[in-house]
Amino acid sequence: LGDVYKRQPLYGSRDLTLSSGVEENKTQHSPIIGWAYDGLPIYGPYGYEKSTGGSVTQLNSGYSVDLKTNRPPTSVFPQEFFIEDFTWNSNTDESYLDENNGRYGVTPEYPNGVYAYFATLESTVTSDSSDPFNNFKKPKFPYLLGENFGAQPNEFNFLSKSNQDEI
C-alpha cells in the first residue's frame, strides 16, 4: 500500500498530503469523492471560503457535541456514540455547512454553483500513537451527509436491485 500511495493519482490531485509524516492543509479545492442518492456531488473537506469562490479552506461541520441528560452513561456508551449526542448550530460564517452537511456555492466542476455535500474533519491533527488517525485529522460528525438530502433523492437508489451491475 505504501508504494500505491506514492504513485500519481488517477484523477485530479490528492486530497491528502503529508509533510514529515503529518497531514497538512490543502490549498486546492477537494475533488468530488462521490454522489449522494439525490444526484448531488460529495466533495472532500476543502472548499472555497465563500460560496462565490475565493481562497480554499477546510469547511466545517455545524454540529457540536451536546450530551443530553437522559442518555445512557458515557462509561457504557462513550461520548459521540449516538446521533443524539450532536446538535446543529446555525452559523453565518460561510465556512460552516448547513444541517445537511452541505451548502450552495461554486466549485471547480460547477462554476455557476451547485448544492454540494462535503466530508468533514476535525480542525487539528491527532497526536496519539495508539490512535489509528495518528498524524491525521479525524472524521467529524456528520462525516458526509446530515439528516436530510439537499434535493429529492432518486427512488431507484433505494431499490434492492440498484447496484453497480445494473448501471
PLM features: residue spans?
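Short, small-residue-biased leader/transition segments that mark boundaries at the very start
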Residues: 1-5
